[in-house]
Amino acid sequence: MRVIVAEARVPFARDGAQLHAHSLVTQLRLRGHDAESVALPFHGRKDELLHEAAAWRMLNLSTSNARTVDVLIATRFPTWFARHPRKVVWLIHQHRAAYDLFGTPYSDFTDSEEDAQLRAQLTALDSKMFAECERIVTNARNTARRVQRFNGIAATPLYHPPPLAEQLRNGPYGDYILLVARLEPLKRVDLAINAMAHVDRSMRLVIVGDGSQRVALERLAAQSDAAARITFTGALWGSAVADLYAGARAVLYTPYDEDYGYVTLEAFLSGKPVITATDSGGPLEFVRDGVNGFVRAPHPEPVASAINRVAADQTLAERLGRDGQSAARAITWDGVIEQLLG
């Protein structure tokens, strides 16, 4: 089949959505399909959202170079606005600031009449575009619940392996807790930094990632009693990240209401337990408290108590990690491609 994967790309950012689209194109090609990614820049400013949706609507992707494109796979807002007779949505997320993040500190939408009208427009337009689609699946149950809640659409969750899957491996259970995330407010890296003041001094925190909050987070870490035990590596990719997963005692991942979250599965495929929060969303679809990790309230002391459990008991960390690894290995690309292409 000839397949286009539609991608709304944030310039100069390498986020989960971009990795998702790249992995999908790669896996389609490995299975003999002629697959390409089509991307338009996405900025996400309120005053640009309708213009960005209109730009996608102007695209007719049913043919390319005088040849038929069999399927268009849309991924995140506003890629499903593109025109194609056989459009499938593999929903990563909608424009969350107008939906589930509205009313939280993570949204730039206010209670103003103007913003209320824009939110209503976006909801109506999304619903109209979804009605054009042959099939709607999501990357996680959490995402499916949102589209059901806001648009009244039933969607099937479709899990897929993380991009690093082939490079991840078991390794020694070292003296550090690993945190891999973009340094943005939704990832709540400050929670991990504040927790370290309550963590046994034998444990370090290694933070992998970059983003708009890096300077503020480095300043927060420098002011902490645990400053000497907190390291920022910046953005790392490929084997460099896999090596850090392999050597960690456990992985800390406490975002706010994550859609899916590759980090959970990357940790499990490395045989490491995951510590997450009760409101972290996607990770809760995989992390079972006391079985393959810990689920704690999103506050420094409870998170620190979970870290201290694995710090004091390496055997426990190994047992939890083994359980997570077996579950993560059951997620494969073959089933994903079959469901997407029908």
What residue ranges belong to the model's regions?
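Membrane-proximal helix-turn-helix segments that form the acceptor-binding/catalytic region
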Residues: S107-D108, S112-I136, A144
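Aromatic "clamp/platform" in nucleotide-sugar-dependent glycosyltransferases that forms part
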Residues: Y256
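Conserved acidic donor-binding segment of nucleotide-sugar-dependent glycosyltransferases
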Residues: D289-E301, R309-Q314
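Short hydrophobic beta-strand element within catalytic cores of glycosyltransferases
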Residues: P273-A277
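Nucleotide-activated donor-binding/catalytic signature segment of Leloir-type glycosyltransferases, i.e.
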Residues: E218-L236
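A short, well-ordered alpha-helix in the C-terminal region of glycosyltransferases
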Residues: R309, L316-A330
